[in-house]
């Protein structure tokens, strides 16, 4: 018992002595690389896809996979083994995405959005149109089924803002990859955009 007390007192003393030691010197902040001119017209040209991956990313990935270079080929094989990256994946669109302090069904949306993204990546790298069709099918299903986030269940729960944020982004990522797929009908793409702007956010 005495040893335990001595250990405790010694630990507390060490913490107190450390806390009373001289203050650490501040580091030297790195200067801006260049001065910001408030009158300068800063423009950025969006070149799709650009949310998570660029076309240059996919060109490099395709080349590395075709060369069977590591670690790219191992990563590709892991993706191809994922249950979310299979043509047989069955999405489960919900009328309402719900997140509250007791739980909710938001994971269903997250899983389906993740599957759409993985299928989209398989299409971008392999060129197999079946994966493009599967990804679009998931996106269309949610856009035509889901009417909002916590719009009737727990509408005042602040968790809905979290759901709108991360679920909205997760659906936007595969949609960004699929927007240049000619098989995604213009009218379906417009329905998806309206859903993302008006219903998948709060």
Annotate each predicted stretch with a short phrase.
Residues 10-14:
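Hydrophobic helical h-region of N-terminal Sec-dependent signal peptides
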Residues 17-19:
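C-terminal motif of bacterial Sec signal peptides marking the signal peptidase cleavage site
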